[in-house]
Amino acid sequence: MKILIILTILAMATTFATSEMQVNPSVQVQPTQQQPYPESQQPFISQSQQQFPQPQQPFPQQPQQPFPQSQQQCLQQPQHQFPQPTQQFPQRPLLPFTHPFLTFPDQLLPQPPHQSFPQPPQSYPQPPLQPFPQPPQQKYPEQPQQPFPWQQPTIQLYLQQQLNPCKEFLLQQCRPVSLLSYIWSKIVQQSSCRVMQQQCCLQLAQIPEQYKCTAIDSIVHAIFMQQGQRQGVQIVQQQPQPQQVGQCVLVQGQGVVQPQQLAQMEAIRTLVLQSVPSMCNFNVPPNCSTIKAPFVGVVTGVGGQ
């Protein structure tokens, strides 16, 4: 770009000088002392002399004057360096990012003072607490507490019902009792016998200590009554008070037992005392070994039915 501008200027100057010489041929130009060109212009003048051929007619050489200052400035103007695009522009100082939800302590907006509005004390009339109406409690007539079955006069009957598995175990085929020959017979059906044995032992374990003898007597009486019905023995049920019936005397009993049947009852008692304690781990007091039958009347006298 610079070379083009310089060549254009030189071409214009040469054309101007040639036209002036053709218009005034009488004017002789005296040679003047050549002044050295500036170093910056010498290569351009030599370049122009090489490109443009000199006219064959010698022309008087005009003194070459240096270009005016304005032209020199024009020639030197392209020599200025243009700003490079890589020049760094002044950077603005990075401001710290302010969070929109953060408040600056220096610029706190003045807040109006918190005004507490006076609340008028409203006391609503509260109705008096009335107790919840409860229905009148009806007192049911208290029934007299019945004594425990062990304390009832019907203890023998109760024990006979509870200890029925013991009677069935000793009387039936599990361990049949022959009241006539006092011997044991064979044992069959062990599975059902084991069930009756467990039930018998469970009932005996619930009997208090003071009623163990009564329990043994109940088992003996139940077996005796069962065998008496099978053998056709007549046992008359009576009231437990002593009474005079002909020549027979009832002693604290519920039935009448002939004297010849007393030995049979003793054999049953002996069998029960030998079987039940060892079978159920049932401790029998020593005084239970004697014959006590408060529920059976013993017949005394002769000829009583």
UniProtKB/Swiss-Prot annotation:
The entry's keywords: Cytoplasm, Seed storage protein, Signal, Storage protein, Vacuole
Keyword Signal tagged: yes
Record field: compositional bias (Low complexity): 27-54, 67-90
Ranges where the record places region Disordered: 27-90, 105-146
Compartments, record wording: Cytoplasm; Vacuole
Pfam families assigned to the protein according to its UniProt record, in alphabetical order: Gliadin
Repeat listed as a keyword: no
SUPFAM superfamilies: Bifunctional inhibitor/lipid-transfer protein/seed storage 2S albumin
Record-annotated membrane-spanning stretches: none
Record-level GO cellular component terms: vacuole
Family to which the UniProt record says this protein belongs: Belongs to the gliadin/glutenin family.
Full protein name: Gamma-hordein-1
